């Protein structure tokens, strides 16, 4: 039981979130701009049940496995000048290859050193390009999740074509690694309005394509629960490092600040810290050293659960009373991921 910050009546988490969400949806229409959901700003409960073992903060790393799945010309990289269309971008493709040759081995060794398991979102073509690396990621105990057939948008596809785009990556990953993905991440998180139904049809447990919360939540889809394990843009290295003056030390401090604030909040609310790593970006020597220091710092604190995203999703489902349940309307009305039917 928790206390709503706007009245003294004791309500469950689901009742509070549901009431505010229903009000937001009721006020929306297809003719109006997308509206953010109204929700509570404070939730209290018994912190012993937030995470396994009474942990007060969950920390989850993603490793984006994309090299080999990018277009041969026009993929984003570190060179500001765009190459002429159709001309192979040799240095940018080599930049992607760095992740496979150097970045992934270095990051996997770092995770082994600290006993941390992560979720690797894999592009099907990248797995075909470097199957041994994909298998090694899984062999070391990390999650193989799906990231599409190639490194490109899929939201503009028809429902059936988007489904095939996802299925192709799932089947490739399962065939090569022996692990069938239950988690999904789209290119820059953009999906069609039918994505939750499609993922549910394909047996997925969760997706990460929404940066709206600092904790997992459930969206009912056709009467069944589907989990969102939210994304964080500002903890994504591909977003952080292009800023002028940003370096490994600044990134380490940003990680610590994020951790410290969420760790403090974790005494009273379920909190989760998500960090997204790209092998070609965070896999460089100095950046791995900064991550090493951050992991040592985070592991020095009591009550921190380092978890794969499939573990977080399953725990959220198994502890539904502590997990926000958001009954959303159609994405065409709310502008947010939800059931399209």
Locate predicted features:
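A conserved mid-domain beta-alpha-beta active-site/ligand-binding segment of alpha/beta enzyme cores
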Residues: 232-259
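N-terminal secretory signal peptides
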Residues: 1-11, 19-24
């Amino acid at each position: 039981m928790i206390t709503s910050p706007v009245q003294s009546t004791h309500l469950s988490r689901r009742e509070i979130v549901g009431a505010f969400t229903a009000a937001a949806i009721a006020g929306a229409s297809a003719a109006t701009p997308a509206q953010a959901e109204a929700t509570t700003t404070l939730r209290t409960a018994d912190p012993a049940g937030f995470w396994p073992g009474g942990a007060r903060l969950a920390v989850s790393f993603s490793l984006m496995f994309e090299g080999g799945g990018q277009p041969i010309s026009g993929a984003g990289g570190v060179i500001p000048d765009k190459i002429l269309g159709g001309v192979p971008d040799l240095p940018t493709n080599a930049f992607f290859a760095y992740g496979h040759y150097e970045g992934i081995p270095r990051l996997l060794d770092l995770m082994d050193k600290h006993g941390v398991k992560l979720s690797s979102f894999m592009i099907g073509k990248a797995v075909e390009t470097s199957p041994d690396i994909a298998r090694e990621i899984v062999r070391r105990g990390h999650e193989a999740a799906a990231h599409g057939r190639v490194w490109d948008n899929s939201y503009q596809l028809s429902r059936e074509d988007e489904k095939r785009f996802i299925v192709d990556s799932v089947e490739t990953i399962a065939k090569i690694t022996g692990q069938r993905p239950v988690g999904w991440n789209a290119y820059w998180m953009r999906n069609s309005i039918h994505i939750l139904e499609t993922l549910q049809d394909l047996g997925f447990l969760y997706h990460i394509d929404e940066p709206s919360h600092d904790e997992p939540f459930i969206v009912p889809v056709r009467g069944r629960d589907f989990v969102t394990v939210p994304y964080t843009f500002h903890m994504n290295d591909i977003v952080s490092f292009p800023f002028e003056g940003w370096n490994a030390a600044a990134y380490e401090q940003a990680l610590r600040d994020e951790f410290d604030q969420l760790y403090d909040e974790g005494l009273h609310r379920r909190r989760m810290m998500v960090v997204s790593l790209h092998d070609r970006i965070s896999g460089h020597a100095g950046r791995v050293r900064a991550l090493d220091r951050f992991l040592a710092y985070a592991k020095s604190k009591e009550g921190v659960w380092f978890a794969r995203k499939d573990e977080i999703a399953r725990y959220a489902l198994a502890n539904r009373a502590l997990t926000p349940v958001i009954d959303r309307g159609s994405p065409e009305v709310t502008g947010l991921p939800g059931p399209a039917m």
